[in-house]
Amino acid sequence: IIKQFDLFAKNGVKNIKIADELFVLNPRHFIAICDMIIERKYDFNIWAYSRIDTCKPQYLEKLKKAGVNWLGLGIENPNDVLRKEVHKDSYQEVKIKDIIQIIKNAGIYPAANYIFGLPNETQESLDFTLNFALETNTEMVNFYCAMAYPGSPLHLTAKKDNLPLPSTYSGYSQHSYNTQNLPSVFLSSEEILAFRDKAWKKYHTNSNYLNLIEN
């Protein structure tokens, strides 16, 4: 992997996105990469990803020194009950706001990723997630709808419950005209999708967010 970074540096590439959504997972892997970047004194501006429950404070100084200035966080949902239903085998309860603040204090910009429409999502929990995102006010945010991607636990559950699934690949896209997200027990897929679009607009026109990115 370090040879790829060597090639980037040789060709003057500064901005790098590491498209591994579990990059900050195994310290023996990502710390070794960071150490080699630091040893070479490369001046990169890196975007990397981490699960919210694997982003430990002791990693942040090393990540920052290697050039990781943006960290995409898989928050999914701030409601512990909803998250636990999806991640029964690997679920860990974490204080999300505290972790985000620690990341900010390390000089790294957090990018929060949220999912609307987990199996027992209600209108109240949708509102809670949006309000949480507004209060946390990260430099970047993504709002997704729960999608039954083939091979995922949600896909297996959807097939078991005879839920409608996309018949084309574009139906699995978050932003295609024929996107087909999952309904929850309490909300239709259309209601969840409409809320996602509303949340996107509300967040990015919110005065606190605009002040953050302007300053």
What is the meaning of each model-derived region?
Residues 19-23:
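Glycine-rich Rossmann NAD(P)(H)-binding loop
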Residues 7, 24-214:
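A structural motif corresponding to the C-terminal lobe/cap of the Radical SAM core domain
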